[in-house]
């Protein structure tokens, strides 16, 4: 048994350190990293406690782009703007290069675009490619060609836990296994259609008030370049406008990732192809090209949602977790309906753009949050909501100015304005100013800020990316925010500072990265009479090495120090090793952690199955082990599996409530089979 190997605490510490040292000394690296490994260097996973669904959606979008990369020899500005890690200047520079030198012959030509830094150069090959120079179809393809030459993908994924939670024995309506099934059909960049069925562990399957099989389904048909119809989706979809003050169900990037796209908000209409049950529309949407500089975007949606109800039948809160495992959770399933319609009209000429946006939504139960709690007083209330805005901007090859100013139906104001400067090929700067009135609210507003709510915040963000030497890359930001109205755990006006500095040194096959982040916040004391500091410091050091032999290796050390009422600190050391062959690949992740409490938890990236997003955190004292393997059985079939094992040395049980596991260790197995034809 795996457990027998790790049952003793003291020997395990020595064993972990020995294994980590051996791995770091003996393993080289891989032929090519995955896009997930590059992407996680741009993440601040500690923000995911409040924005996990946003990060999951970001991951799913990148996965879709990786599955259907963009042909640089047959692309346009709108296609490149789908890539959320590119700034407006970088999109412009790539298009100018293509206009001058297309057709491209090699991906190495991207190095000629000076505004692209090493992270974009590392990410782009996963999402774009240099295709053959062939004449594009002069019009939308015929139904005969679509059905004859279209590509099909079927993917089945299952999660098997080798343990039982308390709810699996009594409390959950379903079994402990999690699984999903997805089908997608594509024809070039013209047609995409699919359906996804998914359920979480504990949810019933063809049983207990769930007669449709999976707990949740997503379905869509997307058409592009159909005459004046640039993009259209029927089914479930996501859409954005401006900088997200009125409408953004698509992206909300973290502050570190903002340094990559220089504050640009990627506003695209796209199919909702993930298992997430939050922030999507259901109905139809379209982008229509009225004339070359003028586009019209319109949408309509009607969808069921989960809600917590008050005694009088009104809705207290809208729930987006998507869990329907217990009788109480099942009673809340789709007990309320939300409708919405709206759109935007945009003008773009040269580098200038101007847009007007409006969203109207209504709910069939009056929304009545508990406003006796002061910080909820200005949460959305009522049964209908209206938000309008103007977005504006100008893009030059050296700088870009963008902004959006919005009003809700009560006249409350929200505004955000960005300035990004490409001072040289080695230096870029970004500044973001925001003011969100504490009376402003919007059901679909997700603007840049400290929290998930675009409300009760004003601040300034300053970021810099600098490459002082050929092999040295520096990034940093400082963000200050002021909240004049009480927030959760904050009973009066408060201030927040968030600062990060990251350096990356690359030399031949080696990469050394150091990161430090400090967050200085204010929260209530025990008596809620005054605010006291709530500070957090996170430091990470990592070293990676690559070689042409197919191996990969990365050694990482994390340290966390937090202060709020009491001091909590912790550390973790981890090693990731991988090998990539022409038809198969495998990776091993091993980590040892020792933290005082949940406040000093540490996040660890692990290789995941396709379309499965997790970024687990660990606290206490224990060991984490994960093994990933993938093999191409033939040109059409691919099998992937992941085995995870966690052993805690400081407790006899894991979790609380119905999630409690009556043992100190867990083992999980994930399986995935993909069939493309």
Where in this protein do the model-derived segments appear?
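Cleaved targeting-peptide boundary
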Residues: 30-38
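Exposed, low-structure sequence patches enriched in small/polar residues
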Residues: 172-176, 281, 336-369, 377-677
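Alpha-helical interaction/regulatory segments in DNA maintenance proteins
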Residues: 49-63, 92, 100-103, 111-148, ...
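Amphipathic, charged-and-aliphatic alpha-helical interface segments
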Residues: 55-107, 124-129, 199, 203
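Hydrophobic h-region of N-terminal signal peptides that target proteins for export
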Residues: 20-28
């Amino acid at each position: 048994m795996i457990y027998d190997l790790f049952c003793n605490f003291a020997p395990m510490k020595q064993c972990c350190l020995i294994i980590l040292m051996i791995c770091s000394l003996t393993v080289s690296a891989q032929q090519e990293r995955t896009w997930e490994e590059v992407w996680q260097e741009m993440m601040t996973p500690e923000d995911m406690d409040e924005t996990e669904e946003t990060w999951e959606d970001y991951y799913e979008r990148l996965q879709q782009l990786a599955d259907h990369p963009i042909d640089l020899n047959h692309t346009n500005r709108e296609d490149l703007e789908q890539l959320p890690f590119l700034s407006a200047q970088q999109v412009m520079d790539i298009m100018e290069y293509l206009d001058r030198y297309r057709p491209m012959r090699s991906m190495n030509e991207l190095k000629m675009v000076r505004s692209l830094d090493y992270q974009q150069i590392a990410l782009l090959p996963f999402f774009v490619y240099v295709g053959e120079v062939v004449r594009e179809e002069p019009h939308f393809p015929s139904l005969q060609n679509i059905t004859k030459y279209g590509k099909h993908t079927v993917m089945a994924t299952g999660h098997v836990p080798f343990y039982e939670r308390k709810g699996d024995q009594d409390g959950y309506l379903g079994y402990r296994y999690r699984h999903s099934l997805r089908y997608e059909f594509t024809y070039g960049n013209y047609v995409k259609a699919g359906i996804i069925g998914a359920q979480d562990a504990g949810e019933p399957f063809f049983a207990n008030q769930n007669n449709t099989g999976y707990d949740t389904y997503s379905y869509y048909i997307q058409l592009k370049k159909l005459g004046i119809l640039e993009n259209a989706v029927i089914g479930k979809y996501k859409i954005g406008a401006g900088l997200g003050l009125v409408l953004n169900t698509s992206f909300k990037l973290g502050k570190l990732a903002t340094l990559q796209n220089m504050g640009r908000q990627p506003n695209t209409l796209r199919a909702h192809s993930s298992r997430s049950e939050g922030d999507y529309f259901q109905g139809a949407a379209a982008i229509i090209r009225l004339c070359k500089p003028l586009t019209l975007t319109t949408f309509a949606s009607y969808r069921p949602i989960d809600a917590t109800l008050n005694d009088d039948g009104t809705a207290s809160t809208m729930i987006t977790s998507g869990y329907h495992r217990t009788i109480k959770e099942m009673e809340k399933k789709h007990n309320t309906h939300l409708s919405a319609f709206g759109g935007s009209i945009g003008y773009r000429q040269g580098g200038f753009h101007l847009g007007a946006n409006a969203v109207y939504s209504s709910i069939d139960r009056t929304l009545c949050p508990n406003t006796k709690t002061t910080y909820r007083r200005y949460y959305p209330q009522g049964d209908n909501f209206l938000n309008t805005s103007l977005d504006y901007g100008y893009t030059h090859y050296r700088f870009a100015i963008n902004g959006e100013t919005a009003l809700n139906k009560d006249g409350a104001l929200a505004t955000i304005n960005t300035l990004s400067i490409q001072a040289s090929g080695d230096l870029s700067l970004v500044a973001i100013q925001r003011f969100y009135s504490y009376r402003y609210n919007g059901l679909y507003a997700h603007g840049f800020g400290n929290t998930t709510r675009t409300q009760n915040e004003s601040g300034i963000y300053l970021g810099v990316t600098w490459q002082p030497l050929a092999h040295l890359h520096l990034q940093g930001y400082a963000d200050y925010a002021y909240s004049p109205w009480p927030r959760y755990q904050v009973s009066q006006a408060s201030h927040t500072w968030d600062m990060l500095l990251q350096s990356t040194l690359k030399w031949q096959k080696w990469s050394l990265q150091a990161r430090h982040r400090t967050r200085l916040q204010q929260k209530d004391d025990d008596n809620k009479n005054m605010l006291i500091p709530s500070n957090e410091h996170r430091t990470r050091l990592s070293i990676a090495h690559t070689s042409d032999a197919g191996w990969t290796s990365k050694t990482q050390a994390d340290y966390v120090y937090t202060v709020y009422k009491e001091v909590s600190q912790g550390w973790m050391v981890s090693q990731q090793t991988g090998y990539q062959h022409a038809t198969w690949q495998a990776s091993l992740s091993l980590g040892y952690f020792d933290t005082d409490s949940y406040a000093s938890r540490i996040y660890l990236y692990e290789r995941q199955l396709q379309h499965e997003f997790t970024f687990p955190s660990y606290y206490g004292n224990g060991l984490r082990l994960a093994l990933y393997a993938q093999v191409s059985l033939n040109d059409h079939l691919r099998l992937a599996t992941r085995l995870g094992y966690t052993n805690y040395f400081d407790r006899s049980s894991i979790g609380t409530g119905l999630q409690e596991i009556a043992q100190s260790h867990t083992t999980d197995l994930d399986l995935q089979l993909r069939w493309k034809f």
